Amino acid sequence: LSKRYEGKLDGDADRFIDRTNQNVLRMQRLINDLLTYSRITTRAHPFLPTDCNQLVQEVVEMLQPVLEESSGRVVPEPLPTVMADGSQLLQLFQNLIGNAIKFKDHKPPEVHIDAERADKGWLFSVRDNGIGIDPQYAERIFLIFQRLHTVDQYPGTGIGLAICKKIVERHGGEIW
């Protein structure tokens, strides 16, 4: 409709069609995120040796346009090879790095990623210089559809960190 009737209707109609298109795109993102969330356990791949350095590099390449636009940068330290579902770890890094870039203040985003040996495996850390999270909301942000900001302030579906939590738990870990 927007292509067919662009400029042929009055301003109100154009705004209505534009708003409808935006809502359709938002609904499409929501459905895709819900499918991703539901498939974490139902369409999971077996755990294989997975190079986390390679995964982070892939995510940085995927997010390069956003990084350039925001003058942001990702600073990974050497990361381990772990037994994991590689596609899910890719999604995990993409969501965490993407959030670090999105939830920024006036400074260009800078995301640091590292890992250190822990008792039962590895402790990964994704830190940034963004707006931060009030400690009182630390658990709430990992619940599905929970947002701390309006869609107008920061776009998104409110599912990304719930996906992260489900992936981490499937891999026997915790996220905070």
Predicted regions and their residues:
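Short beta-strand-loop-beta element adjacent to the nucleotide/active-site pocket used for signaling
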Residues: 111, 115-124
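Short conserved segment of the HATPase_c
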Residues: 133-145
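Short alpha-helical Gxxx[C/S/T] motif in the catalytic ATP-binding
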Residues: 160, 164
